Amino acid sequence: MAINELRAIANFAKAAELGSLRQAAAAQGITPQASSQLLVQLESHLGVRLFHRTTRSLSLTEEGRQFL
């Protein structure tokens, strides 16, 4: 497993815990854009959506709950 994949999984877990990509980014010392990009890369790698996203909320999909 590549380091970037580990970062993407850690980012996913932190976003799921906090319910926010912005807060997950702050907790990891990265930008919100980097957090979002890691999530997109992980979803692309897995071939599933892990979160339902709106401008104000983030919630796990069924696939996201299973992956967690």
Language-model segments: which ranges?
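Short alpha-helical "packing" element that flanks the helix-turn-helix/winged-helix DNA-binding module
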Residues: A8-A15, F67
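Short helix-boundary/capping micro-motifs
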Residues: A13-G29
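Residues within the DNA-recognition helix of helix-turn-helix
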Residues: T31-A34, L38-Q41
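Short, cationic-aromatic polyanion-contact patches
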Residues: E62-L68
